[in-house]
Amino acid sequence: SRSTPVAGAAIAMAARKIHAKAKKIAAHLLEVSESDLDWEIDRFKVRGNEDQFKTMADIAFAAYQQPPEGLEPGLEAVHYYDPPNFTYPFGIYLCVVDIDKGTGESSIRRFYALDDCGTRINPMIIDGQIHGGLTEGFAVAMGQQMPFDEQGNLLGNTLMDYFLPTAVETPAWETDYTVTPSPHHPIGAK
């Protein structure tokens, strides 16, 4: 999907702005320097004092009720992302096919796929997208088509005539990945 390389970058940059403002507010509330704070999941903690912290809920409330002098009230950000260059995932694929010399029938014995989509944000979704893409490619390779007559009329206009592979026809994909973060994306996604 192309949503992470574009929208994901804008979200990451806006989140960084919110994080920076939240840190200023936490430092103000805790009466310490920003450099004395460490971030931990949902809170800023004073380094060396585990009991002195402010949660994001505390900070969000303070952002609207008692922001530090010079800071605009609120805890929100907008960022428009214009990528300096495009990012694309890539992969390598190997298909082992058996072909019956007499009939020409083919069957896929094994299919290996190695993909690199940069920083993996949500592995379950990525695996689903890879399997979906492989299945679509498999369908086209195995004869999926939309035939038209000479007048441009669609001949195969029902799913009875259109090859959509099911779990029965689809091979068991053997997938793996490597991660090479994109230098053109704030979180390395491709």
PLM region spans:
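C-terminal catalytic domains of large/alpha subunits in multi-subunit enzymes
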Residues: 1-190
